[in-house]
Amino acid sequence: MQRSPLEKASVVSKLFFSWTRPILKKGYRQRLELSDIYHISSSDSADNLSEKLEREWDRELASKKNPKLINALRRCFFWRFMFYGIILYLGEVTKAVQPLLLGRIIASYDPDNKVERSIAIYLGIGLCLLFIVRTLLLHPAIFGLHHIGMQMRIAMFSLIYKKTLKLSSRVLDKISIGQLVSLLSNNLNKFDEGLALAHFVWIAPLQVTLLMGLLWELLQAFTFCGLAFLIVLALLQAGLGKMMMKYRDQRAGKINERLVITSEMIENIQSVKAYCWEEAMEKIIENLRQTELKLTRKAAYVRYLNSSAFFFSGFFVVFLSVLPYALLKGIILRKIFTTISFCIVLRMAVTRQFPWAVQTWYDSLGAINKIQDFLQKQEYKTLEYNLTTTDVVMENVTAFWEEGFSKLFEKAKENNNSRKISNGDNSLFFSNLLLGTPVLKDISFKIERGQLLAVAGSTGAGKTSLLMMIMGELEPSEGKIKHSGRISFCSQYSWIMPGTIKDNIIFGVSYDEYRYRSVIKACQLEEDISKFAEKDNVVLGEGGITLSGGQRARISLARAVYKDADLYLLDSPFGYLDVLTEKEIFESCICKLMANKTRILVTSKMEHLKKADKILILHEGSIYFYGTFSELQNQRPDFSSKLMGCDTFDQFTAERRNSIITETLRRFSLEGDTSVSWNETKKPSFKQTGEFGEKRKNSILSSINSIRKFSVVQKTSLQMNGIEGAADAPLERRLSLVPHSEPGEGILPRSNAVNSGPTFLGGRRQSVLNLMTGSSVNQGQSIHRKTATSTRKMSLAPQASLAEIDIYSRRLSQDTGLEISEEINEEDLRDCFFDDVENIPAVTTWNTYLRYITVHKSLMFVLIWCLVVFLVEVAASLVVLCLFPKIFFQDKGNSTKSANNSYAVIITSTSSYYIFYIYVGVADTLLALGLFRGLPLVHTLITVSKTLHHKMLQSVLQAPMSTLNTLKTGGILNRFSKDIAVLDDLLPLTIFDFVQLLLIVIGAVVVVSVLQPYIFLATVPVIAAFILLRAYFLHTSQQLKQLESEGRSPIFTHLVTSLKGLWTLRAFGRQPYFETLFHKALNLHTANWFLYLSTLRWFQMRIEMIFVIFFIAVTFISILTTGEGEGRVGIILTLAMNIMGTLQWAVNSSIDVDSLMRSVSRVFKFIDMPTEDGKPNNSFRPSKDSQPSKVMIIENQHVKKDDIWPSGGQMTVKDLTAKYTDGGNAILENISFSISPGQRVGLLGRTGSGKSTLLLAFLRLLNTKGEIQIDGVSWDSITLQQWRKAFGVIPQKVFIFSGTFRKNLDPYGQWSDQEIWKVADEVGLRSVIEQFPGKLDFVLVDGGCVLSHGHKQLMCLARSVLSKAKILLLDEPSAHLDPITYQIIRRTLKQAFANCTVILSEHRIEAMLECQRFLVIEENKVRQYDSIQRMLSEKSLFRQAISPADRLKLLPHRNSSRQRSRSNIAALKEETEEEVQETKL
C-alpha cells in the first residue's frame, strides 16, 4: 500500500478532491491491485477509533444505571456531525433562493425595455454564482458526513468484536450466527449509507417553511393546495412503502426457503450428483422460486408506483397551485415559472428528503439499540487460580451449562399439552424428564504434576464439559477447582487460523527452533510440511481448507504441545487420524515429549487407558471410576460398557432396544402439524427479556430453530423409557460438546458468509456455541491437498530420543508473547481470507448488455415501446409549445389595459378554458403513457431474472466437479443470493429510473434546443464531456468497489474464525493479537472504502461543475439572443434548472446500472460453465413448456435385454488416474484391480492417501482417465446418470436436505408408501420415523437436525436399498457414531446388502474385520491388494495398524477361510431370524 497524497494535499486540492487524480489515472490505464491503494490516516484507524469509543462507553457504563450507546457516540462525533449539517443546510438554502432570481430575470426581461436588459445580465450572473456556491458547499458536506458514518461504523465494528471475544459460553449459546452477521453487516451499513440524509429531518421542515413563505407572496392561500397535494402524496408513498415492506417480509421467508435448499444443494453437490438427484433438486428449487417471484412482482409493482409518483407529481403540483389562482385572479408569466421552480424544490423536500431522513433515523436508532443490548451481555469471567499450585485438584464440583431451565421446560410442557400431536401421545416428549440436571455432579479428583489423566466415558457423559470447567468456560455452581492457570488446549475439532503452518503452531508464543522442530517431529508433520513448496511458510486459507482432516488435527495438537504450560487439556485429538499415525503420535508426543507435563487426555482407546497414570471414567455426569488401570479391572469389571456407552446390546429386550435407539433423538418438534414452517422472516433482537427472551422460550425445544448438535448427559440411563432428552435444552441429560453430526457438515459457507448470511441464515437457528464445537469445512479429504504418503523423510528434529529431551527447559518459566502484529501486512490478508479475485472487466462490456437484452425476446419489444411513448410525449410537448405563443400571447399584443407590459396578464376570459383543458389533457396523457411505459418494463425485467436463475441453476447442477472444485461454496451461493437479489430487486427499478431520467433529460434538451437553437451548440460538448468523464471514472470506481467488496470478506471471515477457535484463543490468551488482526482487516476495508468515497465525490463534483458551465452558457445565450419576451426565457431557464438535478441523477443511475450489471456478468459466467457431458448449457434440459419427468429414463445400448444391469456387481479397474481439478496434481495414478461379485473390499491407507478420492472416482465425480467396467459394461459407453445409478452411496458427509422424510428417501416420487415403509423397516428406521408427527410427511430442517448422525447414515442406507444398487460405497460410515447405531448399521449391511459388492473406507479396525480383501493405497498407487491371510502373514500397513488383540479376532476368519467358500468368508456368526428382528429400530 502507498502513502496517501491526502497527507500533503492543499486546501484547494482537498476542497475539489484533486488529490485522487493519481489513483484515477492509474485505474483508467491498468488494473488496480491492493498495493495501489493508499494508507489510511491515523484518525481513521480502527485502533484509535475503537479506543475512543470504548473509553466513552466505559465512562457511560460507570456513570449510569441505564447506559446509552447514543450518548457515547454523541461525545465522540456530535460536533463534527453538526458542523457538516450546517454547511449542508446553507447549500440547500441556495436552492430556495434560485427561483427568486429566476423570477426577477423574467420580470426584468422585456424587449420593449432595453434598460432592464442589463439587470437581467447581472441577475443571471448572480444565479450562476448561487449554483457555484451550492456546489462548493454541498459536496464537502456530504463527503464529511459519509466520513463520519464510516468512522462510527468502524468504532462499533471493533467494539462488537471485542465484546464477542469476552462473551460467556452461555451467552454465545443464545446468539445465532445470523444475528451476529446481521448486526455487523445490515445494521452498521446504515451509518455508511444514511448519515448524509440524517440532517434532512430538520433541514427539510425549515426549507418547506421558507418555500411556503416565498410562495405565499406569489399565490397567497392557493399555495396550500400544492402543499396539501404533496403531503397527501407523501402519505400515499408511506402507505405504498408499508405495503411494499409487507410483501418483502412475506417474500423474505420464501427467499429463505430457496436459499436454504440451494445452500444444502451446493454444500452437498457431490452427494446430489452421486444420487442422480439433479432434476429433483432443480424442481424443488424452481417451485420455491415460482412462489417467491409472485411476491417479487407485487413488491416491484408497488415500488414502481411509489417511484413513478415522484416523476409525475410535478404536473399536479403546478396544476393545483397555479391554475386555481390563474382562473380566479389571472396570473403573470413570471409567477408561473417562479412557482414551477419553487414546486420542484418543495416536491423534493416533502416526498424524498424528509421521508428518507425519518427512515434513516429510525433504522440508525434501532441499530444502536441492538448494539447497546449486545454490549451489555454477560461476559466470560476468568477464574482466579493459585499460581503456586503445580497439581490439579477438584473438590465436589457441580456445574450447569444453563440456569433457569426448569421454568422454561415447565412452560414448554404446558404449551405442548395444549397442542395435539398426530400420534395422540402428548406425553411422548416429557414422560420421564427431570428438570434442572447438572452436566457434572460431585466431581472430585487430584492429579500430581507430570501425570497423565485419561478421561473416558460414553457419548454425552460430560468429558468436554470437564475440560471447559477447568478452563473457566463453564463456571461451577458448587465446589472448588485448583490449578496454576497456565493452560494449553487442543479441541476435539481442529481449529486452523488463517496464516502459515508455522504461525498456527507457534500461535504468538516466542519462537524456539529446537522446541519447534521437536514438536513437528512428534506430531508426524515433517512429511506433510516437506510436500509444500513453501514448507511451513505455506499460507493456509480459511479453516485450513487446503489440508486434510488429519493434517488439521495434527497442527492443532502441535499448537497445544508447543506452548510451555503447566496443564495440557487434550480433547480427543486423534479423532481424524488413522490407527498407525495415532499410535505413533501417542507414543512419541503424549508419552515421551510431554512426559514431565501434567496432561488430561479425553479418549476411549483401551491402549491409552493402559498407559495413563490415572483414569477418570464419567457416566451420566458423575464419576463412575477414578484410579489406575489395574484398579479399574479389579473394581469395575463392567467398565467397557460404560466406556462404550451401553451394556451388551444383545442382552436387551426388543422393547429396551427400541427405547435406547429412540433416546438418541435430541431434537423434536412441539408442533402438531405435519409440516413445519422453519423460516424466520424477521431477525431477532439481541434484547434479552424474561428468562432468555420470548424467541428463546418458544424455540427452546423446537427442531425448527435450534440446531445445536450436541449430545447430552443422562440422568438415569437404564431405568428411563421413551425419549430421554433434547439437545437444545435437555432436562435430565445435559450438554456434552461432542457433535453427533458428521465432521464435514458445513455450518457456514466457506467464504463470503456475510454477503449471503443475513439473507438465508436468519431463519436457521445456528448458535455460536455450535459453531465453536463443529467444523464448517470438510474434515475428510481436501480437494486441493497434496497427497500424503507413508514414506518417512529425513528428520528435521534433533535425533536424540524424545523421551530423553525436555523441549521446555530451554525457556523461562513462562513463554513470552511474540508480537506478531507488526509482522503482518494488510496485503497478506488476501492470501488468508480473500476469495478468488473475479476476472471481470473494470467496466461492464456492451456484450453483457446485449446478451441481457436478448435473454427474453419480450424485453426488446418493451424497450422499443418505451422509445415510442417517449417520442409521443416529446411531440405533445412541442405541440403545446407551438400553440403557447398563439394562445397565450394573442391578447397581449392588443392589450392596452396593462400599465406595464412586463407584467402583462396572460390569462383572459377567452383563453382560460383552453388552458385548463390543454393542461389537464397533456398531464393525463403523459401520466397514462408513463404508467404504461414503466410497468411492462419492470415486469419483463423480473421475467429476465427468472430465466437467468433457471439457467444458472441448471449450469451448476450439470457442471463437472473438476470445475466446481475450483469454486468456493460461498462464491457459488452468492450468485444465488446476492446477485439474484440484485436482478430481482435493484436492477429493474434502477433501469426504470435511468430510462425515465434519461428520457426526461433528452426531452428537455430537445425542447430547449427547439426554442433556442444556439443552445444546442452548447449541449453537444457538454454531453460529450459527460460521456468521457463517466467512462474515465467507471474504470477506477468499479475496481475500487470490487476491492472494497473483497475487503469485506476478511472482516466477517475473521469473526467466524475467531468464534470457532474462541476457547483456544482464551486458553492461549491471544485475544489482543486477534483484535489487532481484526483491526488490520478493518483498516484494509477502510482504505478501499475511503478511496471509493473520495473518487465518487470527485466525479460528482466534476459533473456538477460541467453543468454549472452549461447553465451559464444557457443563461447568457437566452438573455442575449432572445427578443420575443419573457415567455421563451422563462421556459428555457426553468428547463435548464430542472435539467441540472435530473442529469446528475441520470448519470448516477447509469453508474448504478453499470455496477449492478456486474452481477449479470457473474451470472453469465456461471451459465457458461462446461457441463459433465460436454453439451452446451441450453441443450441438457427440456423446453420450458415440457414438464420434467419424475424418473430419469436413460437408454443403454448394452442393457437392452431382459437382464437388469448391473446384475452381479463385478468391477474391473484399469489404469485409473484421478485429479480434483483439470490442472491439479494427480491424487491417484494408474490404479488397477478387480473385485468379484458380492465381495467386500476394505480400503487402507494413511490420512490423505486417497481412499475417499478413489470412491469419488468410481462415481465419475473427478477428472479421471482410464477405464472402469461393471459386469462388462465400460463407463465410457453409457451416460453418467446410468453409471451412477449402479452405486449405492453412504458418503462421509451425509446429505439430508430440508424436506419431508418421503422426499429425502424418494425425491422423484417413484415408490409407494408401502415400499418406503418396507425399506425403512429393513434398515431400522421405521420406529424412528413413527415417533414424529406426520411420520413420512414430517419436515426435516437444517440438515436433519432432529436426527442423530447414525440415523442419517441409516437414511443413506435406505436410499441405497431403494435404488436397488448392486455396489455399495461406504466412506467412514462409523465416524462419530454411537455404539448402538454402529451395531445396527453392521447388521443392516449384512442383511440388506448380503449379495452386493461392498467397498469400505474405514479407520475403525473392527469394521474392517468383515472384509475379505484389502486395497492398500500408498504414494498415489495401489501398494497391496490381498486377502486377510496374506495381509497378516506379511509385514504390511494393515499388520502394523492392528493390535495383537485385534489379530486374535481375525483367527476365526483365517482358520475358517480354508474350509468355507469365498461367499461366506466375511459372514458373521449366523443369527436366527428372531434375533435379527430384535435388533431393528
Swiss-Prot record:
Positions of transmembrane segments: 78-98, 123-146, 196-216, 223-243, 299-319, 340-358, 859-879, 919-939, 991-1011, 1014-1034, 1096-1116, 1131-1151
Instruction: Note the InterPro entries from the entry.
Output: AAA+_ATPase, ABC1_TM_dom, ABC1_TM_sf, ABC_transporter-like_ATP-bd, ABC_transporter-like_CS, ABC_transporter_C-like, CFTR/ABCC7, CFTR1_ATP-bd_dom1
Region entry Disordered, spans: 1453-1481
This entry's Enzyme Commission designation comes to 5.6.1.6
Cellular component per GO?
A: apical plasma membrane; chloride channel complex; cytosol; early endosome; early endosome membrane; endoplasmic reticulum membrane; membrane; nucleus
Q: Which domain of life is it from?
A: Eukaryota
The residues the record assigns to binding ATP 1 are: W401, G457, S458, T459, G460, A461, G462, K463, T464, Q492
List the biased-composition ranges (Acidic residues): 1471-1481
Motif PDZ-binding in this chain: 1479-1481
- What is its subcellular localisation? Apical cell membrane; Early endosome membrane; Cell membrane; Recycling endosome membrane
Q: Where is this region: Disordered R region?
A: 653-831
Which of this chain's residues are annotated to bind ATP 2? Y1220, G1245, R1246, T1247, G1248, S1249, G1250, K1251, S1252
Residues bearing PTM Phosphothreonine? T716
Q: What class of enzyme is it?
A: isomerase
Cross-referenced PANTHER family = ATP-BINDING CASSETTE SUB-FAMILY C, CYSTIC FIBROSIS TRANSMEMBRANE CONDUCTANCE REGULATOR
Subunit note: Monomer; does not require oligomerization for channel activity. May form oligomers in the membrane. Interacts with SLC26A3, SLC26A6 and NHERF1. Interacts with SHANK2. Interacts with MYO6. Interacts (via C-terminus) with GOPC (via PDZ domain); this promotes CFTR internalization and thereby decreases channel activity. Interacts with SLC4A7 through NHERF1. Found in a complex with MYO5B and RAB11A. Interacts with ANO1. Interacts with SLC26A8. Interacts with AHCYL1; the interaction increases CFTR activity. Interacts with CSE1L.
> This chain belongs to which protein, by name?
Cystic fibrosis transmembrane conductance regulator
Q: Which organism is it from?
A: Bos taurus (Bovine)
